[in-house]
Amino acid sequence: MTNIRKTHPLTKIINNSFIDLPAPSNISAWWNFGSLLGICLIIQILTGLFLAMHYTSDTATAFSSVTHICRDVNYGWIIRYMHANGASMFFVCLFLHVGRGLYYGSYMFPETWNIGIILLFAVMATAFMGYVLPWGQMSFWGATVITNLLSAIPYIGTDLVEWIWGGFSVDKATLTRFFAFHFILPFIISALAAVHLLFLHETGSNNPSGIPSDSDKIPFHPYYTIKDILGALFLILTLMLLVLFSPDLLGDPDNYIPANPLNTPPHIKPEWYFLFAYAILRSIPNKLGGVLALVLSILVLAIIPLLHTSKQRSMMFRPLSQCLFWLLVADLLTLTWIGGQPVEYPFITIGQLASILYFMILLVLMPIASIIENNLLKW
């Protein structure tokens, strides 16, 4: 008799996705981040659900309700800080996951890659709206500055911003709708992640060499289940170290001051994971130009598959491309640092140079390096 695991309509899907799935025998720890992102999403949904039970999305009580969660709710402080720092862990995993895709040529699965870009935008939108909810100074002014960017859109900009605000400034209506969107988006992200996996399983996983691995596959369970559990333990260990020892390390002290529309903080800046994009936005003196550069800094990922000029898929055997890749990583770290600095000399110039280099590497230097490497193969 056939195992129920392989015949029952529900368990069959789980079996084919996580148990009997044929996986390449040589995928490294860089392939762990997909499962880690899934775990991050589950942690965020669960902690978020418990926070939503005690949170009130009203300008008069939002700040107090978060304080109440931390002081009066049983283990409310740990739930709140797991949610806040869980977002940081989520973005660490996201950036490493995208970086892996760039390095090993995983973008050659166009459907999986494009759904991934949509997922990235969705997670960024969710994180932004979540940052507004505690209704501290940085919440309020961050919401004001970022939503105001839409006013740069010609003709409809101002109307669009006022429509999103639900009034003439960030106020009660804005907070309520941001809470509604922040609650629903993670479930949309879950559905998109399922589609992401669906497309991935149509082709099977890529591997570090970039060479088809059909001739050498191993079952996902137990080999990669145990590997994923090890990764999950590292993730949870790091998260709990952050939560229990320095929960405010990545936050902004200004967010412990209740939102005040009459008092602007000296330096308005987003959470650390948006700083690279914020630096690109600020490096262009024109408002519309800055907004376009901001969107393109992520959207540029969509044209990476079209710019793949190399005869090899992975960067494993391409030293020139490797150098450019790590230069890109250094450039993104520089942009992240600049995003948190005040708008003054020399930071403005460094930010502009780093922004130009970011787009230069991805759009010009990488394709050229690939062509050079193709010619070196003939030697």
UniProtKB/Swiss-Prot annotation:
Entry's Gene Ontology BP terms: mitochondrial electron transport, ubiquinol to cytochrome c
Entry GO CC: mitochondrial inner membrane; respiratory chain complex III
Topology relative to the membrane: Multi-pass membrane protein
Pfam family, one: Cytochrom_B_C
Binding-site positions, heme b b566: 97, 196
Chain sites annotated for binding heme b b562: 83, 182
Protein name: Cytochrome b
Family in the record: Belongs to the cytochrome b family.
Superkingdom of this protein's organism: Eukaryota
Transmembrane domains' residue ranges: 33-53, 77-98, 113-133, 178-198, 226-246, 288-308, 320-340, 347-367
Misc: Heme 1 (or BL or b562) is low-potential and absorbs at about 562 nm, and heme 2 (or BH or b566) is high-potential and absorbs at about 566 nm.
GO molecular function, a single term: metal ion binding
Entry function: Component of the ubiquinol-cytochrome c reductase complex (complex III or cytochrome b-c1 complex) that is part of the mitochondrial respiratory chain. The b-c1 complex mediates electron transfer from ubiquinol to cytochrome c. Contributes to the generation of a proton gradient across the mitochondrial membrane that is then used for ATP synthesis.
Subunit-level organization: The cytochrome bc1 complex contains 11 subunits: 3 respiratory subunits (MT-CYB, CYC1 and UQCRFS1), 2 core proteins (UQCRC1 and UQCRC2) and 6 low-molecular weight proteins (UQCRH/QCR6, UQCRB/QCR7, UQCRQ/QCR8, UQCR10/QCR9, UQCR11/QCR10 and a cleavage product of UQCRFS1). This cytochrome bc1 complex then forms a dimer.
Organism: Mustela frenata
InterPro entries attached to this UniProt entry: Cyt_b/b6_C, Cyt_b/b6_C_sf, Cyt_b/b6_N, Cytb/b6-like_sf, Cytochrome_b, Cytochrome_b_C_euk/bac, Cytochrome_b_N_euk/bac, Di-haem_cyt_TM
Localization, UniProt: Mitochondrion inner membrane
Cofactor annotation remark: Binds 2 heme b groups non-covalently.
UniProt KW keywords: Electron transport, Heme, Iron, Membrane, Metal-binding, Mitochondrion, Mitochondrion inner membrane, Respiratory chain, Transmembrane, Transmembrane helix, Transport, Ubiquinone
Record: residues binding a ubiquinone: 201
Cofactor: heme b
